[in-house]
Design a protein with these regions (language model features):
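Hydrophobic faces of well-ordered beta-strands that scaffold small-molecule active sites
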Residues: 4-8, 33-39, 56-58, 105-109, ...
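N-terminal active-site wall of soluble small-molecule enzyme domains
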Residues: 10-52, 284-286, 307-308, 321-331, ...
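Catalytic alpha/beta core domains of metabolic enzymes, predominantly
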Residues: 77-88, 96, 119-269, 351-354, ...
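Alpha-helix-loop-beta-strand connector modules within alpha/beta enzyme cores
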Residues: 14-37, 86-102, 131, 135, ...
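Hydrophobic or amphipathic alpha-helical targeting/insertion segments
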Residues: 31-72, 77-97, 102
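N-terminal small/glycine-rich loop or linker at the start of catalytic domains
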Residues: 19-20, 102-121, 267-283
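Acidic (Asp/Glu)-rich catalytic clusters
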Residues: 23-28, 48-53, 95-102, 141-142, ...
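Glycine-rich, proline-tolerant flexible connector loops at the mouths of alpha/beta enzymes
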Residues: 3-26, 60-82, 148-157, 299-310, ...
Length: 409
């Protein structure tokens, strides 16, 4: 199927011992794919698996700490330190086995299996997830064991992304630089599972975070590989792109991003939910049979559609806006002009409650900033033909934030 690692769930000692036979069997068949044993609850199983696999995954939430029972218990600092020492006393012998057999490990934290100890001190939070991981990483660093990969997984993509970003920041503070494994737990099946995986994994890959990827679908394992490959290939196409000379807005919090403050222009921006614009400049019908799939706005360029739908909002090129707006066929429909950057001087000459302006990062900043400050009724359509389109679009938004602009994008 194209996977570069194969993970086996290893429930007990019998399964761990059988990894020896599995390893020998696939090597005899000529396969050199590394094997990963996924171990929960029993550190003794991890010890055995480390003898026969290239990597062993352990879960900090249940490696030494008992399975969580949602018991509330306050720990003094002394008691908490004692619990950490218990982890170290058990984890170090495992690291020694891994050193002897050149076995890598993955410290894999699951949002759903944080220990009661962590939850009682940090809550069910990204901070608790990250601390659960760092407790084990600090031992690895202390023991000079660096064949480590880290994963933080959750079925909640917001928690997953924020936790992984926070982990990267905390590792930098502590002088750590371990590779990161990305995945969304139980993403689901079909289109929903693929979208959820893309949201979580794709957001982090776009940040430059992530070294290995696993897509978790409720389907046959082989179906997961093409999805993961597509995500990796998509990001790989941006490799070596031209520098984007941008300056991040100082008020932007990378770990806790909030919605950018904007003014309301019609039903766009302010406290409104994001709108959907459909591009139909090639003459596609603007009539939607499925009312639930009707876009908020339809862009038709400079062409007359076969029929204007009463009540529907249309975006039309600025140079035909006044002509189309005066035609009887448009009665009942709502038309709004869109301007390219080169037509900014004409924005003031056309009357409309909502106007659209296409901008790309690199447009002379002084020119468009002055225009947008003078015309709060303008909504920016952020476009890009850069190899790293997302980075280019982020750069424009940060440039606007640095200028204090509140026009919707």
């Amino acid at each position: 199927a194209g996977g570069e690692l194969v993970r086996f769930t290893t429930q007990g000692s019998r399964e761990a011992e059988n990894m020896k036979n599995i390893n020998a069997g696939i090597r005899a068949d000529g396969y050199q794919t590394p094997l990963v044993a996924d171990v929960h609850f029993n550190p003794n199983v991890a010890d055995v698996a480390a003898l026969y696999c290239e990597k062993v995954r352990v879960n900090p939430g249940n490696y030494v700490d008992p399975a969580r029972k949602f018991i509330k218990q306050e720990y003094t600092d002394e008691e908490y330190a004692h619990e950490l020492q218990k982890i170290e006393d058990r984890f170090v012998p495992f690291l020694n086995i891994c050193k002897e057999h050149h076995t890598a490990i993955r410290i894999g934290v699951n949002h759903g299996s944080l220990s009661d100890r962590i939850r009682n001190r940090y809550g069910d939070t990204p901070e608790g997830i990250v601390e659960s991981c760092l407790e084990f990483l600090r031992i690895c660093k202390k023991e000079n064991f660096h064949d480590v990969v880290i994963s933080i997984k959750s079925s909640n993509t917001v928690v997953m992304v924020r936790s992984m970003r926070l982990l990267v920041e905390e590792m930098e503070k502590e002088g750590m630089n371990y590779p990161l494994h990305l995945g969304v737990t139980e993403a689901g099946e079909g289109e929903d599972g693929r979208i959820k995986s893309a949201v979580g994994i794709g957001a982090l890959l776009a940040d430059g975070i992530g070294d290995t990827v696993r897509v978790s679908l409720s389907e046959e394992p082989a179906a997961e590989i093409p999805v993961a490959r597509h995500l990796v290939d998509y990001i790989g196409k941006k490799k070596g792109h031209l520098l984007i000379p941008a300056a991040a807005c100082p008020s932007f919090d990378w770990l806790r991003p909030t919605r950018r403050e904007t003014v309301a222009v019609g039903n766009i921006g302010g406290n409104n939910v994001p709108v959907v614009i459909s591009n139909r400049i090639n003459g596609e019908s603007t009539i939607c049979e499925n009312k639930d799939a009707t876009p908020d706005y339809i862009y038709i360029g400079g062409k007359m559609p076969k029929q204007f739908v009463p009540g529907q909002s249309y975006i039309v090129d600025y140079n035909v806006y006044e002509t189309l707006n005066s035609k009887p066929e448009t009665t009942g429909a709502k038309l709004y002009p869109i301007f390219p950057a080169m037509a900014m001087p004409l924005i003031a000459s056309i009357k409309a409650d909502v106007k659209f302006l296409t901008l790309q990062f690199g447009t002379p900043a002084e020119e468009y900033i002055a225009c947008l400050k003078a015309h709060p009724e303008v909504v920016v359509i952020c476009v890009s033909n850069h190899q790293n389109r997302l980075g280019d679009q982020r750069a424009l938004v940060h440039e606007m934030m640095n200028a204090g602009l509140k026009n919707p994008v």
